[in-house]
Amino acid sequence: PTIGKLVDDAMLAIEKSNTSLKGVLPTNYAREALNKTMLGELIDLISTIGMNEESDKSKDILGRVYEYFLGGFAGAEGKRGGEYFTPRSIVRVLTEMLEPYKGRVYDPCCGSGGMFVQSEKFVVEHGGRVGDIRVYGQEMNNTTWRLAKMNMAVRGIDADIKWNNEGSFHKDELADLKA
C-alpha cells in the first residue's frame, strides 16, 4: 500500500477508537494529486515529537504542534471565507476575565476551540484539573468545526461541539443548555 493509503487507514482506526472523531478526520491522503514525498516528510517530522510515558507533557507538545499548524491554516482559511482567527492573547484575556474554575464554558462561534483550550489551561494553572469544566460550542464552518474536534481530541478535552451551516444565532443546536 502507498503511504497515503496507510495514513487513510490510520485515520479510520483513530475514528473507530475515538467516537468523538467519527466522520471528522480526513481520509483522502491516497489521492493521486497529493505529493507522497511531502506527506512522508511531514510524518517523519511529527514522529520526532516525544510521546513518552508522561502523557500530560506529550499532550502539551502535540497540542502546541497542532496549534502551530492550526494557526497557519486558520489564518489562511479564515481570510478566504471572511472569518477571522481570534489571537491567543485576546482569548487569554477573555479567559482571565471569565475565570472558568468550574462548570460550563460555552462558545457559540467556537472556531478551532481556542477558548476551550485556554479555559482548561486556566483551570489547571489555578489548582484545578482537566475535567472541572465542561465545554460546549457551535461552529458553522464545517472545516473549522472538524479542526475544533481534532484540537479537543489531541489535547484530551471532552467537548460537545455542534456543527450547523446556519450558525448558532440562526439555529441554536444547544438551545437546551443551561448555565
Residue ranges of each PLM-predicted region?
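Non-catalytic, mostly N-terminal accessory regions of nucleic-acid modification and defense proteins
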Residues: P1-Y101, D160-E173
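Conserved S-adenosyl-L-methionine
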Residues: R80-K178
